[in-house]
Amino acid sequence: MYMRRGLLSIFLAAAIFFTAASDRAQQPAAPQSPQLANPAPPQGQEPPAQSPQKITTVVNLVDVLFTVLNRRNKLVPDLEKSDFKVFDDKNPQEIRYFSKQTDLPLRIGMLLDTSNSIRDRLKFEQEASTNFLFSVIRRGKDEAFVMTFDDEPQVIQSFTGDAGTLRDQIVKTRAGGGTAVYDAIYDACVKELSHPPRPPGDQPDVVRRVMILISDGEDNLSNHTRAEAIEMAQRTSVVIYTISTSTQWIQLSQTDPNKLANRKTHLTEGDEILQDLAEETGGRAFFPYHVDDLDQSFQDIGDELRNQYSIAYNPTNSVLDGRYHKIRIELPEHKGYQIRSRRGYFARANGDVNVKPAQAPTGKSNAP
């Protein structure tokens, strides 16, 4: 009898130890290794009960924020869960959570190219970035930081909600050196936007992570690749909006009477890179002629970021292989509507959330 009790005690102790070790194995990764998907349910939804099976389900949840525009490029705010279909690598998925995300606090990374190649457009960069911050930031709710990059990235102003403070640092920037665009994106995601300041007071702990990249897109010094920069933005749920500083268009437009209408037909290689960065992460690329051309665009960006939908699902293929998965969201009954979202995500790898994809997601997509 005593021997049986002793064996039972040993068995229970081993079981408790195994359960604790298993729980620790499911803890989030360290700050320098951001998770690919937000493990928490979307705002306004109840989390699942704390059973071992459902804990695993929450960890594998894929959460996608997206914007819907009508034929006139106006926001569509009144759609319901039943209107949408979501596909993971072309496989239909069951939508587990659906919500409308409105008036979210913004956490903005303003990335300014200060390399020698944009010397003639530095004033444009300063004016464009300052105008954006004053147009979009709401003091007490939104915050932004400023990072410059030439030979290497450098944060010149940490997160603040004061647009005037941000402007004061922006106007001090000077141009010179090479261009490390991809390193700047990667560092901004990992070091700043992966763990941005939480909203003050009793506001819900949900923020929108945004990057505004102003550059000619011509990288020549980065240690990271474009695929790695996009991967990190997708892992940290960062949406990239790009603004081109290309001067080739300005020279061409002097003999083109349809200068603004034809801008996208004359994209430089750098412009195409900027477009790819934006589209892969659910943002937009802008190719302005003058700073004034951006005024309405900035207002549109602010409206988009504060009026979005959220869909979450558990992938039917939940193998932890670190592989890149394409996401497609459809509106079967609204064929003329546009859906703007990130194009995919990286599945967790068994024991390593930072496994690189077998194929870089830098090509074009058939997503709406």
Please identify what each model-predicted range represents.
Residues 23-368:
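Scaffold/interface architecture of coatomer-like assemblies
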Residues 1-11:
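Bacterial N-terminal signal peptides that target proteins for export
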Residues 9-19:
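Bacterial N-terminal signal peptides
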